Amino acid sequence: MMEEENTIRPHQEIRQLTLEEKKFLLAVERGDMAGTRRMLQKAQDTEYINVNCVDPLGRTALLMAIDNENLEMVELLINYNVDTKDALLHSISEEFVEAVEVLLDHENVTFHSEGNHSWESASEDTSTFTPDITPLILAAHRDNYEIIKILLDRGAVLPMPHDVRCGCDECVQSRQEDSLRHSRSRINAYRALASPSLIALSSKDPILTAFELSWELRRLSFLEHEFKNEYQELRKQCQDFATALLDHTRTSHELEILLNHDPTGPVYEHGERMHLNRLKLAIKLRQKKFVAHSNVQQLLASIWYEGLPGFRRKNMALQAVDIIRIGIMFPIFSLAYILAPYSSIGQTMRKPFIKFICHSASYFTFLFLLMLASQRIETFIGGWFFADSSGMLNTMEELPTKRGAKPTFIEWLILAWVSGLIWSEVKQLWDVGLQEYLNDMWNVIDFVTNSLYVATVALRVVSFFQVQKEMIYNSHATDLPRERWDAWDPMLISEGLFSAANIFSSLKLVYIFSVNPHLGPLQVSLSRMVMDIMKFFFLYVLVLFAFGSGLNQLLWYYADLEKKRCPEVSPMSALLNMNGTNDPNACIVWRRFSNLFETTQTLFWAVFGLIDLDSFELDGIKIFTRFWGMLMFGTYSVINIVVLLNLLIAMMNHSYQLISERADVEWKFARSKLWISYFEEGGTCPPPFNIIPTPKSIWYAIKWMRRVFCSGSSAARREHLKTIRRKAQQASDRDFKYQQIMRNLVRRYVTVEQRKAESQGVTEDDVNEIKQDISAFRCELVEILKNSGMDTNVTAGQGGGGGGKKNRQKERRLMKGFNIAPPGSTGSLAPVAEFSTSLDNYDNQHEILSSTLSTLFTPNFMHKRQQSQAGSGGGGSESPTTPTAPQGTQGAAMTASSQVTKYNKSALKPYNKRIAGHKKRWGTLIEAAKVGNVSKMLGRSKSEDSVCNSSHTSTPVHGQMRVTYAQNSPQQEYGYHGETSSTTISTPTPTISVVSNSPAAHAGVGSHFFHTTSGLTAIAALKRKRKKFSSSKNICPVTESVAAANAAEILNDKTLKRVSSYPAAEAGVQHNPAQLVKPRRHEQTQSQHDSVETNSTFTLSIDPSNTSVNSREPLISTSCVSTTGAIG
């Protein structure tokens, strides 16, 4: 227990603020320039406060001014040389541009080359930002264009972070010291680099920068899986920025220059053939949103349908007719291009859509030939032409089935098409390179297909020469039936590979159909599902191998017994057959579990229900072995069929959902890749015409040889120099046009973003800024009035603070100390040490208030106060705020005391019931009263049904009774009397006195009246509506009920009138003890009742002579006189 008491908790390590420091921070929070300037000047002279002190939330005065966006206060604090530390980072975080400029100017004055920046000197434990955060990084995180431009103009730089696999000394040391900080610093750096504003301001080519950064972030997301989501979000941000720039292109000329820009190529001129280098780069870096943008797609569509004007406006039937016509004529187009490539029909062949139709028609012809080969069309043709010759017909039927047979006419055509397909793939591999070639999955499929065809041709050649070699020793080697061939005969293997190649060739149609808007999205979904199937297949093979190994180990012996019973395999089959033990099904059953491969096949087909339990009825198998084998088979079926297959279905469904959500973007991206592949210069002729040498190819070969062998001549050198100068000029023109368009796009983008920011509705920050301006204006106005010689004690008293619930909360926490309570505190609101001395001056009053405020009005307490007044001999009281009663009114005072005694119990009983229902509100008030922060609690509610008639003013006559509660407190400074964190409230001293009927004592005094029909009715109403009765906030709910009951019994023929539940003071109240206060306006709003001066005098006046015409109850007037200030 002692250890817990002596433990220093984290919230106690902060140094406790003094009263003056709290006043200083509160003045800064409210925007009081004059008060803050006086305090700073005094602190500069006497150092009575620490101007760099922090509030319980760790904010210095400068940070509070930045949070409130008070530029004048920021300049004032900087002029008095407060520590800035990370104030620049805070101002950037708040996007306070003016403060950023002021702090940067201050930084230029105070920074030395050998020292650190101000934000680097802040403690890592208490600083809001990590050490790797610089002003430029933070501004980029906020994406504030204006602040980023200010920092870049002043020379701020943001270096590229090192690679994630970097092995330099700096990276190695950083990873060893703190790997988490090293990774987070890289993320912070990339988050800044991905800022659209920073890219627009610092890059000459923002689109290229966004592309490269997006690709780098994609790579990092695969390398650092722990931060994959963060990198993916930044990648998406870069893609959105590049797409947003594309939104602002207005003409086709701008779009063409943008998409055809090549940093190393010639300048693009309008009307030339588009090479679309920038768009190809976007496809390479997988910028799907950029490629699928409507502007890009419109340009691509215009290029795609360039050869067929009006094609898109035709109906579907006419479009089909045009496509079929061009497809049928593809040999004519191909031959025309070979013979005359620059003729009109040859140029038509170069149009992308015409080229696509010709290539598709060529591929459909190839598939038709494959179908003819699989159907052995030569046999049918032979049957047509040689139906009369049976010998010739048999020869033609047997020719394809013989070993080493020569290729048929259809197979020769297929070989020509395969040669053309291989040549086109070789040319593509030469143009784009191996890495780029392998990035496209369809290229991999084409490579596998062509490899199968090449292997088929090679095996056919091997089989042919093998048979020719055998015919030397056996002339009937080719007549051997197929069923007697060797199992691994090259002819059989070639047929298997050829059939597999046919499958891949047919699947290539899916790629061609991607141009269709209906089949294209399905093709994209299929490609995504293939990846899921491959992931699932890895797990499936693992389970399949595990159970296959187990079952083969368990059943291999009994499978061998079944094998011996098979007449086709066992040498004893004839003997077994004679004995009658031969089983024809044994030839099938023994293969089920004979080896690991056969067992694995058995389990695979079991997934489709093709294996039954009869396979476990082996020869000689025992009961336990059969049961154990069937149990393993059942477990495999549950795992594979119930679990894994449903998992595959769920994975494929998830993939389809992902694709369907962005099906349009995915399909347009895939279609754009296909379109651009036909925009290239080469590969114009389709297979098999592409293997025919053309005159253009011969001319290109001659030029290449001339350039290689004649490059050393003087003419070649002169031509080379001209080429260099021409390329330099072209590069200058290219860069000028591109940069001009890029500047326009960036300007439009920034303009639109600023308009979006300005068009946003009113936010909480805007409201807080208005509140801060009003608070600062109020403080400035009070200071002006004070300098003009006016009494501003009332106006500058407690005030309403900065305004608003949050500002009041900040001020309350500041004055209470919030989380810096001493260890010995047990209450909900701990007493503050520096105010404990104020308790010594008011011991008696604090004892009375210690339990509950209602004890102020007990009979004994009231009797003691009467005796004290009687002992004074009727003279004036020493207290200036407590006038004594004249001698002639002592009887009335004693009567009031007796009535208080009489009604005390009856009034306290219902009050105790009521206070239970309002325990929360009064508990808050009492706790707040303990720390002297009553001002924020007293103006929270207002009686909605009370009426204050300020026109009813009357002069009290002789004999009027007044109950006065006066309290004193130490002198308070700077007009923040109600916001101090004092631990006690000075207890009011109740005095019952009779006010004389002197005119001088009541000149200019107004009263508020309570209205009710009778004394008892008034008491009941006060009990029911005590929550709305205002005097209960100032003193105690019992006081008014007791006083009202007292007045009702003494003068039951007078009228009892009510006033507003909470009277507010006016600015012109004078502190004359001989007079009552002037009447106060009841129309004040709730914001005017935020706080009340605790050093006030409450006066209850009972005038038995001043009654209304129709009233039988006495008039009761109340007033509240402030000794140091009025209600703010």
From Swiss-Prot:
A GO cellular component entry from the record: plasma membrane
Residue intervals on the Extracellular side: 347-403, 466-492, 557-629
Region described as Disordered: spans on this chain: 865-898, 1064-1111
Annotated localization: Cell projection, Rhabdomere membrane
InterPro entries: Ankyrin_rpt, Ankyrin_rpt-contain_sf, Ion_trans_dom, TRP_dom, TRPC_channel
Comp. bias regions, Polar residues: 1085-1111
Primary location recorded for the protein, binned into one broad class: membrane
UniProt tissue specificity: Expressed predominantly in the rhabdomeres of photoreceptor cells.
Gene3D superfamilies the UniProt entry points to: Ankyrin repeat-containing domain (1.25.40.20)
Pfam families reported in the protein's UniProt record: Ank (PF00023), Ank_2 (PF12796), Ion_trans (PF00520), TRP_2 (PF08344)
Signal sequence annotation: none
GO molecular function, one term: inositol 1,4,5 trisphosphate binding
One GO term of the biological process aspect: adult walking behavior
Regions crossing the membrane: 326-346, 404-424, 445-465, 493-513, 536-556, 630-650
Biased composition (Low complexity): 878-893
Record family assignment: Belongs to the transient receptor (TC 1.A.4) family. STrpC subfamily.
Function summary: A light-sensitive calcium channel that is required for inositide-mediated Ca(2+) entry in the retina during phospholipase C (PLC)-mediated phototransduction. Forms a regulated cation channel when heteromultimerized with trpl.
UniProt subunit comment: Interacts preferentially with trpl and interacts to a lower extent with trp.
NCBIfam families: trp
Protein name, per record: Transient receptor potential-gamma protein
Natural source organism: Drosophila melanogaster
